[in-house]
From Swiss-Prot:
Glycosylation sites per record: N342, N394, N1125
Organism: Trypanosoma cruzi
Assigned keywords, A-Z: Cell membrane, Glycoprotein, Glycosidase, GPI-anchor, Hydrolase, Lipoprotein, Membrane, Phosphoprotein, Repeat
GO molecular function: exo-alpha-sialidase activity
SUPFAM superfamilies: Concanavalin A-like lectins/glucanases, Sialidases
A GO term from the CC aspect: intracellular membrane-bounded organelle
Protein known as: Sialidase
Cell membrane listed as a keyword: yes
Length: 1162
């Protein structure tokens, strides 16, 4: 692995003393060698070589840099080229093996000037200077070396060109095409026989061009990705360099693109986001930088099924490089690509087919060209949002009622809206301003009192100014709309008849088709002045039009959007004939929008706040992103799925350092979002299934602790609900499916880290249900998992205070079951403790709301029993496992809402315990495991919502515990592994954004740990494994949001630690690894977003490691100047196969040379 970067020794200015340096590793980043690749001329204090742009071919590195001797101004402001030169240095990599040890070296040739290849005149202009695009350049499929470059002319105008060599660098030429003026720092890739050149534009949206031949002019890619990304929320700030690379993932060729949101403005450029596109659909993977850190220049590398990002961070003009492993982001990408492939595979050319996976969506898809963009589908339940089938952009709905095969809009303002420019900064349907085809099937149920809108494109947010549309009037006539051109009503319509509508616009000409026939008067100019329109949104009905003179009654069966020219007559006819297939049952279960970011478990206990099992996407601590998909540490977006402790988002799909399960968007710990799937620990949502401890909900199935409801399954201790399904610990929702502790969402399916269960939804104190949805953070189980306060269910996984099943462990109000552990929100244990919000446990007894019991197993409001397991609301028993809301018992396991017990295992919402395992939002417990809303217990394992315990394993948001295992939302514990967002830890290894590790307990959002492995924003813990927002723990291994590691350590965003290996965003430390955004630590290795440290090993968003230190978001180590905008290259077996780079500003306020690089573990 090789890194190339600017080394700025004295200041962060680009006009200072700068060298180009290289650092390389042959042992997966364990050790590094450093070289100066290209020295500046040393003729003045501002001599410099800048903006390295790198090509890798075979085992050679071609590095192009600009050279300046004494000038002190920015290069594009130079009036002539006297102080400028352009240099090419070639490095040759050799590797050898001796005695089983691999060694490598890079031999750099002397830089050669290429100034002689730069013509004095170009396309009628007098030229001045040129530089590389500052990033990765490419080797074309024909073997040519291709550099995208930025050129200035004598008028100081900047534009982009292609600079290429056909003979491995001996001679060079400029291609004929060029960009518009103002386009700088270009990056390029090869795509389907063309070059795609992506350029920075200050104060405006990015321009992307296509070039099919070096001898032909460039063409702006207006129908795909040009003008999609803005430099800031209002597109009125400077732009930024970007990474733009083509890779093959899951068998699909796609492009990865990074770009900061720049909320702060100017050249600060904060919140670096990662995007995915196949040159048709565009998906926001999420934010890859942390919080609001300034992270302009970046580079992405995908190699050996691993994804990495190198980016700079700027803190008060002190620059550092950060290298991050994007584990969760890669899982999200794979999930999205599976969705795309499933939809595409289900829709062969001209073969329309209705999609209805898992009863959640109904859409007819007719791909008429490779450039098909499916706009949205209708959800089964009453929606506030209609999600795009390709998971890119959602639509908003108002006054919508779910009907067979579609949505019925009724009442004033009833309709749907799909944003175009309303998406804000990043507009994924920007192509529609040039050409589009909009298709829908509609049925009108009654005549309006005046003309009412039916379908179209609007130029303003109010919907008053339309570009193209169709209305229907009280005389049963159609009223087409062609811009401001007056049109006479034509044709006729019938009540109750379904019509197939097609609206097309290309070359500023609009047409309307009804049932395959061109409507009279079509073919009108919709933009008379010739300007390019700026479409605000597409609409169906009178979406939120309060000025509507009539109440609309329209049913929409399907809506599709094509990003292409007007369809021809044959294609229109094909669309019309396919409508008869609408209503056919579907075949594409895998493409459904099921729960997200969790992975299914088989014959096991599924619960909330469980850690991911296999390829899962977990998310957390994301910040808002605006008009975009927001994800981990992202910022708000508009109509979108939000996740992981994120703030509300509007149109976007958000996730956070998580890993999706099956082509699905899921979230957890998220705050309210609109058109989104909301889950775990969220507050009420609309059209959602709400659960556990929820307040009343309407049209839903209410469960878990609920009081009676009408035609509904209501359960344990909840407040009444009407036709709704509510489940454990959630707040009220309206016609929606929400789950435990979830925040409000609108028309979405909320699940909370759970995966689907088998047609049954059982809940606390509820009666058995069939074909239903199971909730509260549970994952599916096969031979059934039953939980507290429920009645029995059969081969199904029931969650959150649900009733017992057979063969299972029955709890609260249930009948006993054998060897199975069922509980709501429990974490995994072996043969023991079941707790709330955890993962499954085996041969253990969990219960809920039970009172104390004596050597017996009693359940649900039962009186004391002997040698048995007691559960919910039962009377006291001794040596028994009691749980959930139980009163104190002795030598027993108590859980969920239980009162204090002694030698007992209590979980979920329990009070503090000592020598026990406490978890999730619990209060402290003593040598006892207490669970679910229980009071303190002694010698036991306490979990879910419990407070601190000592010598235990504590996790997610837990409070401290003593000799116990604490999990989920618990506070500090001792001898424990603390993770994510924790503060200082001592003798431990810290990790970041990683998922479970072995042998160690890793979790997320935990607080500090001591003699333990502390990671990601975690605080110290003592001899306990604490995770997820937990407080300090000691000797343990902690991780968060990462992938599993074995006796290894990964960390991020943690604060200072002592003899510990911490990483990610930490400040400098000495022989140790310190973590993310942390303060200094002693004898530790500091890495990731940290200032330089010595012998350190850092990794990012950690992937599995073995007895090694892995860290995340690590910055350069070793006393040196800092570097940025670098290039990373993978050089396996002497062959440089991939590149990874950035370019531009980098500083470490240190006059020392060389050691200016980040550390990384591969």
């Amino acid at each position: 692995m090789v890194a190339i970067a600017d080394a700025r020794y004295e200041t962060s200015s680009e006009n200072s003393l700068i060298d180009t340096v290289a650092k390389y590793s042959v042992d997966d980043g364990e050790t590094w060698e450093t070289q100066i690749a290209i020295k500046n001329s040393r003729v003045s204090s501002v001599s410099r070589v800048v903006d390295p742009t790198v090509i890798v071919k075979g085992n050679k590195l071609y590095v192009l840099v600009g050279s300046y001797y004494s000038s002190r101004s920015y290069w594009s402001s130079h009036g002539d080229a006297r102080d400028w030169d352009i240099l090419l240095a070639v490095g040759e990599v050799t590797k050898s093996t001796a005695g089983g040890k691999i060694t490598a070296s890079i031999k750099w040739g002397s830089p050669v000037s290429l100034k002689k290849f730069f013509p004095a005149e170009m396309e009628g202009m007098h030229t001045n200077q040129f530089l590389g695009g500052a990033g990765v350049a490419i080797v074309a499929s024909n073997g040519n070396l291709v550099y995208p470059v930025q050129v200035t002319n004598k008028r100081k105008q900047v534009f982009s060109k292609i600079f290429y060599s056909e003979d491995d660098g001996k001679t060079w030429k400029f291609g004929k095409g060029r960009s518009d003026f103002g386009c700088s720092e270009p990056v390029a890739l090869e795509w389907e026989g063309k070059l795609i050149i992506n350029t920075r534009v200050d104060w405006k949206r990015r321009l992307v061009y296509e070039s099919s031949d070096m001898e032909k002019p460039w063409v702006e890619a207006v129908g795909t990705v040009s003008r999609v990304w803005g430099p800031s929320p209002k597109s009125n700030q400077p732009g930024s360099q970007t990474s733009f690379t083509a890779v093959t993932i899951e068998g699909m060729r796609v492009m990865l693109f990074t770009h900061p949101l720049n909320f702060k403005g100017r050249c600060v450029r904060d919140r670096l986001n990662l995007w995915l596109t196949d040159n048709q659909r565009i998906y926001n993977v999420g934010q890859v930088s942390i919080g609001d850190e300034n992270s302009a220049y970046s580079s992405v590398l995908y190699k050996d099924d691993k994804l990495y990002c190198l980016h700079e961070i700027n803190t008060d003009e002190v620059y550092s490089l950060v290298f991050a492993r994007l584990v969760g982001e890669l899982r999200i990408i794979k999930s999205v690509l599976r969705s795309w492939k499933n939809w595409t595979a289900t829709c062969p050319a001209f073969a329309p087919l209705l999609i209805q996976p898992l009863r959640r969506q109904r859409v007819v898809v007719v791909p008429l060209s490779p450039r098909l963009v499916l706009l949205a589908f209708c959800r089964q339940r009453l929606p506030k949002r209609m999600g795009g089938s390709y998971r890119c952009v959602n639509a908003s709905t108002a006054n919508a009622e779910r009907v067979r095969n579609g949505l019925k809009f009724a009442g004033v303002g009833g309709g749907a809206l799909w944003p175009v420019s309303q998406q804000g900064q990043n507009q994924r349907y920007r192509f529609a301003n040039h050409a589009f085809t909009l298709v829908a099937s509609v049925t009108i149920h009654e005549a309006p009192r005046a003309a009412s809108p039916l379908l179209g494109a609007s130029l303003d947010s109010s919907g008053g100014k339309k570009l193209l549309g169709l209305s229907y009037d009280e005389k049963h006539q159609w009223q087409p709309i062609y811009g401001s051109t007056p049109v006479t009503p034509t044709g006729s319509w019938e009540t109750g008849k379904r019509y197939h509508l097609v609206l097309t616009m290309a070359n500023k000409i609009g047409s309307v088709y009804i049932d395959g026939e061109l409507l009279e008067g079509s073919g009108q100019t919709v933009v008379p002045d010739g300007r390019t329109p700026d479409i605000s949104h597409f609409y169906v009905g009178g979406y939120k039009r309060s000025d509507m003179p009539t109440i609309s009654h329209v049913t929409v069966n399907n809506v599709l959007l094509y990003n292409r020219r007007q369809l021809n007559t044959e294609e229109i006819r094909t669309l019309f004939l396919s409508q008869d297939l609408i209503g056919t049952e579907a075949h594409m279960d895998s493409s459904s929008d099921s729960s997200a970011h969790s992975t299914p478990s088989t014959p096991a206990d599924s619960s909330a706040h469980s850690t991911p099992s296999t390829p899962v996407d977990s998310s957390a601590h994301s910040t808002p992103s605006t008009p975009a998909d927001s994800s981990a540490h992202g910022t708000p977006s508009t109509p979108v799925d939000s996740s992981a402790h994120g703030t509300p988002s509007t149109p976007a799909d958000s996730s956070a350092h998580g890993t999706p399960s099956t082509p699905v968007d899921s979230s957890a710990h998220s705050t309210p979002s609109t058109p989104v799937d909301s889950s775990a620990h969220s507050t009420p949502s609309t059209p959602v299934d709400s659960s556990a401890h929820g307040a009343p909900s309407t049209p839903a199935d209410s469960s878990a602790h609920g009081t009676p409801s009408t035609p509904v399954d209501s359960s344990a201790h909840g407040t009444p609900s009407t036709p709704a399904d509510s489940s454990a610990h959630s707040t009220p929702s309206t016609p929606a499916d929400s789950s435990a502790h979830s925040t409000p969402s609108t028309p979405a399916d909320s699940s909370a880290h759970s995966t689907p269960s088998t047609p049954v939804d059982s809940s606390a104190h509820g009666t058995p249900s069939t074909p239903a949805d199971s909730s509260a953070h549970s994952t599916p189980s096969t031979p059934a998992d039953s939980s507290a306060h429920g009645t029995p269910s059969t081969p199904v996984d029931s969650s959150a205070h649900s009733t017992p099943s057979t063969p299972v462990d029955s709890s609260a109000h249930g009948t006993p079951s054998t060897p199975v552990d069922s509980s709501a929100h429990s974490t995994p244990s072996t043969p023991v403790d079941s707790s709330a919000h955890g993962t499954p446990s085996t041969p253990v007894d969990s219960s809920a709301h039970s009172t104390p019991s004596t050597p017996a197993d009693s359940s649900a409001h039962s009186t004391p029993s002997t040698p048995a397991d007691s559960s919910a609301h039962g009377t006291p028993s001794t040596p028994v496992d009691s749980s959930a809301h139980s009163t104190p018992s002795t030598p027993a396991d108590s859980s969920a809402h239980s009162t204090p017990s002694t030698p007992v295992d209590s979980s979920a919402h329990s009070t503090p315990s000592t020598p026990a395992d406490s978890s999730a939002h619990g209060t402290p417990s003593t040598p006892v495991d207490s669970s679910a809303h229980g009071t303190p217990s002694t010698p036991a394992d306490s979990s879910a919502h419990s407070t601190p315990s000592t010598p235990a394993d504590s996790s997610a948001h837990s409070t401290p515990s003593t000799p116990a295992d604490s999990s989920a939302h618990s506070t500090p514990s001792t001898p424990v592994d603390s993770s994510a967002h924790s503060t200082p830890s001592t003798p431990a290894d810290s990790s970041a954004h990683s998922t479970p590790s072995t042998p160690a307990d890793s979790s997320a959002h935990s607080t500090p740990s001591t003699p333990a492995d502390s990671s990601a924003h975690s605080t110290p813990s003592t001899p306990v494994d604490s995770s997820a927002h937990s407080t300090p723990s000691t000797p343990a291994d902690s991780s968060a949001h990462g992938t599993p590691s074995t006796p290894a350590d990964s960390s991020a965003h943690s604060t200072p630690s002592t003899p510990v290996d911490s990483s990610a965003h930490s400040t400098p430390s000495t022989p140790a690894d310190s973590s993310a955004h942390g303060t200094p630590s002693t004898p530790a290795d500091s890495s990731a977003h940290s200032t330089p440290s010595t012998p350190a090993d850092s990794s990012a968003h950690g992937t599995p490691s073995t007895p090694a230190d892995s860290s995340a978001h690590s910055t350069p180590s070793t006393p040196a100047g800092s570097s940025a905008n670098g290039t990373v290259l993978i050089l396996p077996d002497g062959a440089a196969l991939s590149t990874f780079s950035g370019g531009g500003l980098l500083l470490c306020a240190c006059a020392l040379l060389l050691h200016v690089f980040f550390m990384a573990v591969f």
